Amino acid sequence: MTVKKRDGDIEEFKESKIVRVIKLASSAVKIPIDDDLMTKLVKFVVSKVSKLEEPIEIEDIQNAVEDSLMKYNLYDIERAFHDKRVERSKIRFKAYQINKEMEEKLAASNIQNSNANMDESSHGGRKGEMINSYLKNEALDYRINQKFAKLHKNNHIYEHDLDSWALGMHNCLSIPFDDWMEDGIITRQVYIRPCRSVSTFTQLIAVGKQLQSLQQFGGVAATHIDTSAVPYIRYSLMKHYLVAWLKLTGEFNNLNLVQMAMDDYEEEDTGIWHNRLEDWIDDRKTQFLKETGLAYKDFYIGNEKLDSALYNSALYDTIREIKQSVEAMLHNLNSLQSRSGNQLPFSSINYGLETSEEGRLFTNAILHNTIKGVGNGMTSIFPCQIFQLKDGINTKPGDRNFDLFELAIRSSAKRMYPNYVNCDWSVQKVAFEKSQALKKKALDSIASEEFKMKVASLPWAIQDKLGFHFDKEEAVFKMNDYEQPFEASSTMGCRTWNGFDINFTEEYFLDLLKKTVETGKLPKNYLYSAIQKDGRGNICPSTIILPTYAMEAKKKAEKDGHPEYSVDYFMKALEKAIEDCKDELIERFNWICAQTVASASFMWENNAMKGYIPEEGIRSAMKHGTLAIGQIGMAETLQILLGCNQLDPRGMELAKRIEQLYKDKCNEYKEEYHLNFGVYYTPAESLCMTSYDKFLKKYKLIENVTAFKDSKTGELKPRGYFTNSIHVPVWEKISPFQKIDCESQLVGYSSAGCITYVEIGDNAEHNLKALMQLVLYAKAKDITYFAVNVPISECTNCGYNGHIKFDSCCPKCGAEDKYINHYARVTGYLSVKYQHFNRGKQFETKDREEHVQFWDDWVLSEEIVTNPHYNEVQMTA
């Protein structure tokens, strides 16, 4: 007899193989089979399969084996054989699914566009998607506790970035650029020297973001790029001033600059290479400083000690360098697809608080270049730009940086960037006060008078950076009432946020002081504040799919005969879901912390993540980051349970109850586990579609949940997506003030990141003061992070820039929609070509109502509009 194997090969039937599989099954249940019985079993199998057409199928042989065991009443052995058979079938089917998925990724035949920043059709995109598919299966089948894997598969709790779960990568990070600029950075191939000009500063910003993005799966941020740039703008000013001074010497006029620039030589003793022109300048720098009596500290904009002619020449060259450097930075961050071989790094920059002329010029250059556009005037997608709003600095006329705020508004109206972060957010203020109180308690606890005096004798700059100063007259430590730049509110673009660090303790601060006293300088691997943003990040997020729990609760309550208790059933289920989410995050956190330093050597060698102590492993740094418990579908959940969303007072009441539970549980876990659990309002780029699809498959079309009623036919049609986090649904016809009023009641519960945005029409550029009014109103309402969406379309055929509706032709040249870039905000970041969005995001983008349609005072004028909300804004701002 012949047998057809599963791979298609044909081979002779072998009785020995029947004996082997029966013995394996009997061994599994520890029931021996003697030789006589084994002979009978094999004989039965042979007689049964010999009647079949050759070649015999494997499944038929296995059926015969089961029949033989049942015939001789070997039920336990038959069950063991059957279970093993089912297990092997599942493995084979899983392998088939994986191979099928790999084929689809390789051929780009089933493009999902799960990430609008990735081209899944490209070589790099297909390669990346194939690897990601394998790693996701690895995570779900072998890495994650099967309880959590089941919750993920059944649409209860979503495990983000499963491919990175398998690898043990963390999410995102605010890079400590101040340290990198001062010390330089080490890469695998080269050491990059410290910056000594604004042009090298912006180059290192771009390079640093790209290098760090390869160590993680989320975004990278600069928390105060305008302040960070100041020292290097001053270096540039000094360099240009020196050159201007040298040009006045007769010697300069007789130089052969080309020959000197090309004349390099190697130093015999050290092997270091030098350049004759650079040597000539360096040799005369000492002479210059001696003759002029100047030092580095004298080179700042506005110093009247400097020679006016030389100063103006140097200032002109410095301003040009700033503008060109910023332009180059934007080009680099929009063009160098260094992430996974086919993506741009998800990068963000925060600015707006620096009041020095140098910092103001840098901010001005960012905004002017953003308005102008990159390349042939295209909107800059990266970095995500965040303007930091703070009373007394930039929120009203007379404030030092109010003019920059006005320019930011002009930029937002044209390019959507910058977004706006509220540096007076009530949650941030409470966290700052708590951090300062912790430090004060630690300082007051110092028992040794000798150590106390050593701390008191630290340089003012160090004390200031640590948030205190020693009052010599009163002989006491006093705490600063202002934040350091690395403490101020900033965000990592999409919305992620770092709040109060539970692991920045009094003991930690005292140890920091001890190390500082010993060395006379601040240790670079330590954190300096409990609310520090630099060197911290979101370690890992998970998201609870609220509509799933809501529908299950409603069904259970109805089944139990108590439909009026649906909300109570839901709240109980949600509490358990949050508990499960916490357990899963701890499992993932422990796996991340189990990775070696070699897995992200660039990050650890350069102290990118603060708090790293080699003897304690990478957990010493990871524990200062955030573990985020997220959510999706608040609006749909309220519809399921109450028949309304959060715009209705009943809906808002339940929404607050839900968020309070999130907040209470996260605070409880934070204290219990000494990990920074936080409430996260999930961006949900692909999840908005995948969670919806699974829900729809199970529960079908439900009005205002998975479907909307067609206004013409009255038929229910699929919506295509779930609403992100706690947002008011995009299809609601409300004014921007109503949307802000609604969401402002919920954002205060979030400690790990949130965003509020409004949709503005294509006349935003003609309503700048009205747009400013909206931003200030959001701030007055204690909105954390705010953005405006304006319709931006660019024709790649003729360069036309203006509002072009989806699926329309260019009004200037008639080019088809495929030649038109439609920009839209997807998760906090911008994306271009809505065709590259996943199906759910395409539906959501098209559903967005322009909120200004419902604001009667939105007019084509730059005059301040009369609005009942405006007085409130003015009073608050």
Segments from the language model and where they lie:
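Charged, amphipathic alpha-helical regulatory modules used
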Residues: 1-105, 109, 848
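Conserved catalytic cores of very large enzyme subunits
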Residues: 97-623, 644, 648-822
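Short, mixed-charge aromatic SLiMs
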Residues: 44-50, 69, 654-668, 845-858
